[in-house]
């Protein structure tokens, strides 16, 4: 049995606490929001973020981050990506040498273009940082529906520790050394999911969605491979797998925000309606900046940025994508 501290009491942190508790681990959840912790203590259910999912009485809750870090062997960092650095700064004075921190948020820091694990490593250099991601909505994990994810780390030993920590009959965990590919797939798919949602909001059909998913993973792969990621990762669970579920699921906040924008909502109106952090909005500018840095064309992500930040109508953005210059589907293919 391990002692695990979960930093962040949102839907994902709450769902993962259930997985860990069911595996027999000691689990403590930290949140900076006192009212959230009081509600969890009283109800043993996150009635705002994960209603209907009852947590075991063995799970404890606190607003004392020092206590959570010092009292637990392994930490799971589950705050939204936009709060990663500020939370890591709070954690840094208390993290022990070699303590494992599992990052489960998906995003790219806009001003530095760093992945989540890179941000954590820069603020807490003594930590052993891992990541875990894949097609995994908290709502389904909380209902104990079969889910498969990937644990990535710099060393095989750390990845396997994380694998053993979480894996059970309804939560399968693979391992991977390609942390960069995992994080790029997990963050950039949120931007493509916004586009998929916009297509839904405009009333377009399955043909449009299939094209966005297929061309979306092509865009993500070109950039990620240019940055050093492996193609196998992008066409695995943390790439195409995560992209499919985020573009298709009713649980996807990125798809929902995009759908509202397609229906005529502004970006601000859509995010207020979703009522949770829409990671794709924060990753969109960073994705575009990475494309420029590595001299890679990403037409879908370019158009999403124009819709989000330049008030371009979503329908016009789709039309421009359809009317781009004629080209071969894959530049690596040629006629003999």
Swiss-Prot record:
Pathway where this protein functions: Membrane lipid metabolism; glycerophospholipid metabolism
Biological process terms in GO annotation: carbohydrate metabolic process; glycerol-3-phosphate biosynthetic process; glycerol-3-phosphate catabolic process; glycerophospholipid metabolic process; phospholipid biosynthetic process
One Pfam family from the record: NAD_Gly3P_dh_C
Primary location class: cytoplasm
InterPro entries membership: 6-PGluconate_DH-like_C_sf (IPR008927), 6PGD_dom2 (IPR013328), G3P_DH_NAD-dep (IPR006168), G3P_DH_NAD-dep_C (IPR006109), G3P_DH_NAD-dep_N (IPR011128), NAD(P)-bd_dom_sf (IPR036291)
Any one of the GO CC terms: cytosol
Enzyme class: oxidoreductase
Record: residues binding sn-glycerol 3-phosphate: 106, 134, 136, 189, 242, 252-254
The reaction(s) this protein catalyses: sn-glycerol 3-phosphate + NAD(+) = dihydroxyacetone phosphate + NADH + H(+); sn-glycerol 3-phosphate + NADP(+) = dihydroxyacetone phosphate + NADPH + H(+)
Molecular-function GO terms, alphabetical: glycerol-3-phosphate dehydrogenase [NAD(P)+] activity; NAD binding
SUPFAM superfamilies: 6-phosphogluconate dehydrogenase C-terminal domain-like (SSF48179), NAD(P)-binding Rossmann-fold domains (SSF51735)
Function per UniProt: Catalyzes the reduction of the glycolytic intermediate dihydroxyacetone phosphate (DHAP) to sn-glycerol 3-phosphate (G3P), the key precursor for phospholipid synthesis.
Family, similarity comment: Belongs to the NAD-dependent glycerol-3-phosphate dehydrogenase family.
Residue positions of the active site: 189 (proton acceptor)
Subcellular location field: Cytoplasm
Gene3D superfamilies: N-(1-d-carboxylethyl)-l-norvaline Dehydrogenase, domain 2 (1.10.1040.10), NAD(P)-binding Rossmann-like Domain (3.40.50.720)
Keywords assigned: Cytoplasm, Lipid biosynthesis, Lipid metabolism, NAD, NADP, Nucleotide-binding, Oxidoreductase, Phospholipid biosynthesis, Phospholipid metabolism
Entry protein name: Glycerol-3-phosphate dehydrogenase [NAD(P)+]
EC number: 1.1.1.94
Binding site for NADPH: 11-12, 106, 138, 253, 277, 279
